[in-house]
């Protein structure tokens, strides 16, 4: 009947609209995924530091409105220059990759890991107070120390990291918190490396 075919046409049109909507949503999803992908450091798969200011501004706003804690870890590969000089840049890249994997494995899915410098990573630990951040940092340091990084044409190398830890204590400027984590890292290196220091 004509009523039946009209109903069928309406159903097909509705289905077509739904398919178009799903295609649009999938397109948006792939676009978002691609922008995150473009925001990653190609070697270590960690986030590019250009996204750090925006992320910290958002996290600082959450800290202020919800009174939730926030901690940062500044992680630096010890004696990285001598690894590069002794075994070559390819070996240095392998070490950085393995350290980055270990950092990513040691934190939660809700945390953020940035490639901050040549051999430096900055970890944003959301909703994490000082004591909990210290446990995470110590676990990370220990995991890296246990690694044996295989290199082409050379025996596996042992790697260590120094870590500076700072927890947000009310100062409104994110850079102030980064500087505190950096100062703690400097102290960790000055005290002999392969350790965690808090400010």
Where does each model-flagged region fall?
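Active-site-proximal structural segments of metal-dependent nucleotidyl cyclase/transferase enzymes
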Residues: 55-87, 103, 114
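Conserved nucleotide-binding and Mg2+-coordinating catalytic segments in signaling enzymes
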Residues: 36-54, 75-89, 97
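Catalytic-core segments of nucleotide cyclases and related cyclic-nucleotide turnover enzymes
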Residues: 134, 166-199
């Amino acid at each position: 009947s004509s009523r039946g075919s009209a109903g069928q046409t309406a159903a097909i049109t509705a289905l077509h609209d739904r398919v178009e909507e799903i295609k649009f949503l999938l397109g948006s999803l792939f676009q978002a995924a691609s922008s995150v992908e473009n925001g990653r450091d190609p070697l270590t798969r960690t986030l590019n530091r250009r996204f750090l200011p925006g992320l910290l501004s958002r996290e600082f706003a959450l800290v202020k409105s919800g009174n939730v804690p926030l901690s940062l870890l500044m992680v630096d590969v010890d004696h990285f220059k001598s690894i590069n000089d002794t075994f070559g840049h390819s070996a240095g890249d392998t070490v950085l990759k393995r350290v980055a994997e270990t950092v990513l494995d040691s934190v939660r899915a809700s945390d953020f890991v940035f490639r901050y410098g040549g051999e430096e990573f900055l970890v944003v630990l959301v909703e994490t107070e000082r004591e909990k951040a210290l446990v995470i940092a110590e676990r990370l340091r220990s995991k890296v120390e246990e690694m044996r990084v295989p290199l082409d044409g050379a025996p596996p190398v042992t790697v260590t990291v120094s870590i500076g830890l700072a927890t947000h204590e009310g100062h409104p400027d994110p850079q102030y918190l980064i500087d505190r984590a950096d100062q703690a890292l400097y102290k960790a290196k000055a005290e002999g490396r392969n350790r965690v220091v808090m400010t």
